[in-house]
Amino acid sequence: MSEQAPIPFELKKLIDVAGDLELAVELRLHTIPMIGRLGSQEALVALLDIAGNQKATYRERDLALKTAREVLKVLASRRD
């Protein structure tokens, strides 16, 4: 079994903010594109986790899914 690389500190902080349901929705929505700009596989997984979170608002889930799609395009182009 391969070990997973540790999550970078910046990404961990952004994930914490995006997942904190006690924070304002607008703040959480602002964090999602920031996660996407990191453009890593870990960021993609984090975005998919947000998109799959039933407690997140529809807007958060939709934005996370759209952002994940963009990150996936970037990751796919790096492999070509």
Question: Which residue stretches match the model-derived regions?
Answer:
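Low-complexity, intrinsically disordered tandem-repeat tracts enriched in small residues
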Residues: 18, 50-51
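Buried hydrophobic core positions in alpha-solenoid tandem helical repeats
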Residues: 13-15, 46-48
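Alpha-helical repeat scaffolds
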Residues: 79-80
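Structural detector for internal amphipathic alpha-helices that build alpha-solenoid repeat scaffolds
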Residues: 1-7, 16, 26-40, 58-76
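Core helices of alpha-solenoid repeat scaffolds
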Residues: 7-11, 44
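Short inter-helical turns and helix N-cap capping residues of alpha-solenoid HEAT/ARM repeat scaffolds
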Residues: 22-24, 54-57
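Short, charge-rich amphipathic alpha-helical segments embedded
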Residues: 40-46
